[in-house]
Structures are given as structure tokens and as C-alpha cells.
Amino acid sequence: MMGHRPVLVLSQNTKRESGRKVQSGNINAAKTIADIIRTCLGPKSMMKMLLDPMGGIVMTNDGNAILREIQVQHPAAKSMVEISRTQDEEVGDGTTSVIILAGEMLSVAEHFLEQQMHPTVVISAYRKALDDMISTLKKISIPVDINDSDMMLNIINSSITTKAISRWSSLACNIALDAVKMVQFEENGRKEIDIKKYARVEKIPGGIIEDSCVLRGVMINKDVTHPRMRRYIKNPRIVLLDSSLEYKKGESQTDIEITREEDFTRILQMEEEYIQQLCEDIIQLKPDVVITEKGISDLAQHYLMRANITAIRRVRKTDNNRIARACGARIVSRPEELREDDVGTGAGLLEIKKIGDEYFTFITDCKDPKACTILLRGASKEILSEVERNLQDAMQVCRNVLLDPQLVPGGGASEMAVAHALTEKSKAMTGVEQWPYRAVAQALEVIPRTLIQNCGASTIRLLTSLRAKHTQENCETWGVNGETGTLVDMKELGIWEPLAVKLQTYKTAVETAVLLLRIDDIVSGHKKKGDDQSRQGGAPDAGQE
């Protein structure tokens, strides 16, 4: 007869949790993350101050920036942090709402799991609800004329009012709109707006925020290579290279055996002739400026200076691409292949200015720039970083509207309208699925509720009146005024959000809730003791099954 010995399948230093315990653990982790972020929603949002491991300070109310800095251990919480990053990369805004919404979706599901309802039932109800949420959103959305700059500024302003930069909202809105319109590129009827690549934000501490501006061109943190080169050139002809103007060394180690003294002189002479040839290839096109990503030797500088050409070396590849887009030049790999149409003539001015202790090269007044630089000034690095984050959000909002010119009302109005539509629809449903379906409508109310809480108004009274308002005809644009905590019509207040952001928020929130409800087992592998000593403070790796 076999003895009743336990059979060990998993290695002894792994920890396994399964069933209800895991689901409630996941839900609590998601709720905890949502609670951290909750106070960062709306115009009356609070800021968070975070210290990173290196001792740097981050002050922000941007959901994604906060979660990026927090070190999270629980695997479910990690996936919550991940969705805020996805939201930021996809649409650039709504990072706070998506976390709060996902947390609330899981929170309302907990009640059904306690009543022994199977997660699959809850999931299929959530999926149905998501389809209806999307169709309702599209119904209440309105088209927008993207050439109406007042309306565009209004939309960007709705995004900026919740940020630290709201004091300078008109300046920030104009900067964002100008920058996005500048980098907009249409080809064969296809719009391309690449903010990350072509709209660079340069932060220079000093001055005041009002000094910030958009440059019609590019600014790089470089000086000329030779002190006698020109520093102010009008209508410059610009040549861009990604090769070095130095003597080419052999790819692998090269040995040369010399027997006579003249041979040594000849080798040096060949080096000089090679560099002279490179420079002559460039000089024959009569450029005013040569910009290269690699080095320029002293001899090459001498030849270029004699030809009255300004040279700038070791420019970043990304900056070189921006200069090419701004002045219409083409980046060339070999100077001997340079042709007239590779020369950029679109820039109006090249000048070198000293700001603080550093020299900056400005290539501005471009005729038709498809790249720009946003110059930010401000009191300290922390403030500048926060302003940059806010501006990135504003530019993303602008980009979303240009690519998909559909708007939905902000201030929690869309959420209430969608919640009302779901509640009405659930009345016609039968079977057990109607309860989780109705719970989604309840979860959506978390956005207006949080807005009311953050301005310190009475939550229950206002939410009840808002619910009542949405049962009336043509009242789907009523929401919460985040400044005063009163109910207003968003049409009159002018608070609009791009449809693309809202759709992405709902999809991501529901998908995350569904993903976390599906998990019923977590197996975490613990580190070996010796490993733990050497890397103390590191979170244990947790795998999900």
C-alpha cells in the first residue's frame, strides 16, 4: 500500500496562490493603484512628489509619470502601471482616467465573485457592455472643423486646465497648436503627424515661462568648430553629412612597414590629400554651413574656414533628421556623392547664441518647416519637466483631433451619458448577465464622482442630480464643472475631449479588468538567498499563469 506522502510538483522555493484568494488579491492591487492616482483627476487635482532611487525629485499630477516612478511588486499592479503607459503611447492623454476606471471596473466585479458568480459570466457581460459603450460614445460625438483655430484652442485648453501649466494656458495652447500644425505632413491623402520625432522640446533653465516659444526650425546645443567661422548667416545653404571629415582609419588593425624616411612623409601627405579632396567635394557646391554627425579634423576645419564655411560637428542623428526636414536638405553619407539638390536652402537664418553658459545653434525662419523646436524657459528643472509633460499631452490631444476630428463632452458628461444608456439597455436584458452589465454603468460614474470629490463638493447630492439630469431629453452634455463642483452644460463651458482618447480609455480599462478577472493562479518564484543578499530591495520576480 502506498504511503500518503505529499507529491511535490512545484519547486519548494515557489509560492502558489489560487482561486478566490488570487482574484481578490488582484482586485485589491488594482484598487490600491487607482487610489494613488484618484486625487490627480480634474482641474483641482493634487500633485505628487516622488523621489527616485538616485535622489532626483519628480513633481507631477500626470498619471503615467507617477506610476512610472513607483516601484510595484504585485503582478496585477504591474499590469495596471503598464496600461497607463499604453494609454500614454497610443493617445497621450487620459492616463489618469484609465487607471481609475479599470480599478472601479474590478471593484464592482468583486461583489459578483463573492456571490460565487463565475468570472466568465462577468467577462462576457463586460464585453457586451464595451460594445455598447463604444456605439453610445459615437452617437453622442460631434464633428469638429479642424481649421477653426478658436475651437482647436478650446479643445487643447480642456486638456491643459487639469495640469500645472493651466496658469499659462493660452500660451501653452498656442505653442501646442503651432507645433503640431508645423510637423503635420500630408502625402497621397495620408496624414502623418509625428510629434516624438519632429517636435523636439528643449528645456533651458532660466528666464520665465512666458519666454517659451515655438521656433520655425531647429535649435541644437552646439557651437562652431573653429573660432573664426561665421556665427550669423542669412539664407544659409546647408549641407548635412553623416560621415566624418577625418582621415579614414582601417576597419581592423592596420600595420604599415616603412623602410625609407620619404615613405613616412608620403603617408602623411596622402592623409592630407584625402582630407583636402573631401573638403573640395563639399566646397564646390558653395555651401555656407556643413553639419555632420561625426568628427571634423583640424585640417578639414582649416580648409572649410578658408572657404568661409561654418562647420558644426557631432550632431545627434535625430537632430540631423529634424534639420533635414526643416530646411529641405538631404543627409549624405559620402561627400563625393554630394549634388546640388542635396543642399538645403529652406532656412532663413543661422545664428549662434549664448544662453546661460552654453552656446546654441539656431536654424530658424524656415520657409516650409516640417520640423520644429519648442523652447521652454522656467525657474527650475523640476518645473520645466512638468511643463514639458503637460505640453506633450496638449500636443497629443491636438494630434488626435487633427487625425480624427470627433469630439465628446468632457467633465464626466460622456461617462454619465454612456452609463445612462447602459442602465436603460440592461432593463431589457434577462438572465444573470444583466447584473454585471449594469455594474459597468455604475463603474463609469466614478469619473464624475472623483471630479466632485476633488473639488470638495457634496458627492451624493450632485451625482443624484446629474443622474436625474441625464434621464431628460438632450441633456447628454451635462457634467461637472471641475473648478467649482457645480453641474453645467459642457457645450456652454466649452469642455470637449477627442473621441479617440475616450474610446481608447474605455477599451483599455475594460480589457484590463477582463484580463485580471481571468487570472485564477499566481505562481511566484522566490530568489535564492545568496541572490537576495546581493540585490537587496529588488522586488521578487512574479510570473503569472
From Swiss-Prot:
It is an enzyme of class 3 (hydrolase). InterPro entries: Chap_CCT_gamma, Chaperone_TCP-1, Chaperonin_TCP-1_CS, Cpn60/GroEL/TCP-1, GroEL-like_apical_dom_sf, GROEL-like_equatorial_sf, TCP-1-like_intermed_sf, TCP-1_chaperonin. Disulfide bonds join 366-372. Pfam families: Cpn60_TCP1. The modification Phosphothreonine is found at residues 430, 459. It is found in: Cytoplasm. The modification N-acetylmethionine is found at residue 1. Mg(2+) binds at residue 93. Residues 1-24, 526-545 are annotated as: Disordered. ADP binds at residues 42, 94-97, 162-163, 411, 482-483, 497, 502. Its main location: cytoplasm. Its EC number is 3.6.1.-. It catalyses: ATP + H2O = ADP + phosphate + H(+). Keywords: Acetylation, ATP-binding, Chaperone, Cytoplasm, Disulfide bond, Hydrolase, Isopeptide bond, Magnesium, Metal-binding, Nucleotide-binding, Phosphoprotein, Ubl conjugation. There is a cross-link at residues 15, 248-249, 381 (Glycyl lysine isopeptide (Lys-Gly) (interchain with G-Cter in SUMO2)). The modification N6-acetyllysine is found at residue 222. The modification Phosphotyrosine is found at residue 247. The keyword Nucleotide-binding applies. The modification Phosphoserine is found at residues 11, 170, 243-244, 252. Belongs to the TCP-1 chaperonin family. Component of the chaperonin-containing T-complex (TRiC), a molecular chaperone complex that assists the folding of actin, tubulin and other proteins upon ATP hydrolysis. The TRiC complex mediates the folding of WRAP53/TCAB1, thereby regulating telomere maintenance. As part of the TRiC complex may play a role in the assembly of BBSome, a complex involved in ciliogenesis regulating transports vesicles to the cilia. NCBIfam families: chap_CCT_gamma (TIGR02344), thermosome_alpha (NF041082), thermosome_beta (NF041083). This is T-complex protein 1 subunit gamma. It comes from Pongo abelii.
